[in-house]
Structure formats: structure tokens, C-alpha cells
């Protein structure tokens, strides 16, 4: 009886292990066939501020670098451009981060490609290069100037988070809508904010509502 039970247990264990192996193979197959896109990674700002090189081994310093992204099967990386609301000259600060990303791509032409449109993305994937895109986390970086929005779009920024934790003159953030920091100031989008949304729609730029206040959310819709 014990011998029978041992054989049965062994058979079940083997079946389980085979199933796990097949599932793992299925996962790898699906991952390899898919275009894997990470739409937000703060590595650009981290490297810019700490003077790290993304194309070097950053284990122990950051959660990702170029080699780890490629090993992990990331096909498209949207690099986040960020600064807090206290940063002086945030538009220039954003552009320096963009310059950093362009420098990475220039140093690694066989591994990375800057993409601004779908056809370029597909080209990068077919060439087994990391397709580099950009998103901007905080509308304060356009400094209340639609022309600066256009300029950032032309450089490759394809989404803008309307606010970070700080509000700006044309949109209020979730943090400030839910605290007393706004006092009696209006919440949501201003008329200029609505112009910003219309311009983003004209450009085909994604309107990211992360971090925005509830009134801003409804005003955008």
C-alpha cells in the first residue's frame, strides 16, 4: 500500500513539474512574441540628477539600466521627465533631461533608437533595439506657454501628466485639492488649461491624469 502511495505521489509530482515547465515555456513564448512597453520609468531623472550613465551597469544603484532592460525583454521604454514644483526654470531643466536621453541614444546606436511615431517604433522593434520615448510628469514644466508645449512635443514628448503633486496656474493636483493649501482658490482647469488640453489633442499627445485632482479630472473629460 505504501509503495502504491509513493508511486502515486511521485506521478503527481512529476505531472506538476511538467505542468510548471510548460507554463514557464508558454510565458516565455508569449513574452518573446509581444511588444513589451513600459510607459513610465524614472531612470532618466535619477541618472540626470546623480550623474549616472544608463548604459553602464547600475546594479545596486538603480532598479534598471540599458542591459537589464534588454535582458528583461523591454521593447519600448517611455522615459519620464520630472522635476518638483520648486525647481527653478523647469522648462530648461526638462530639456537638459531630454538632452541626456539623446546622448544615451547617440552613444548606443546598435542598442537604442529614439522614436516619435509608430513606424519608427516598429522599425526599432524589428531591429531589436530599445525604442526610447518620453513622457513628462508635471505641466509646470511648460511654464504656462503653449509654444513650450509644442517644442517639447517636437523633441519627442508624447504624453504629459497635467500636474504632479503640486498644482500649476492652470490645473490643480489631487494633493492640493484634498488639503487646505488651495484655500479659496478655484479647483480644476482654468480657461488656459482647457486651451492646453485642446492643443494636446491637436498634437495627438496623451493627456495623463495621474496626480490630478478630482475636479481637474472631470474638467478634462
Please place each PLM-identified region on the residue numbering.
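Bacterial Sec-dependent N-terminal signal peptides
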Residues: 1-29
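A generic signature of intrinsically disordered, low-complexity regions enriched in glycine/proline
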Residues: 6-10, 42, 46, 212
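Basic side chains
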Residues: 7-8, 158, 199
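Alpha-helical transmembrane segments and their juxtamembrane interfaces
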Residues: 17-18, 50, 218
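N-terminal hydrophobic targeting/anchoring segments and the immediately downstream early-domain regions
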Residues: 25-183, 221
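Histidine/acidic residue-rich metal-binding segments in metalloenzymes
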Residues: 144-154, 176-221
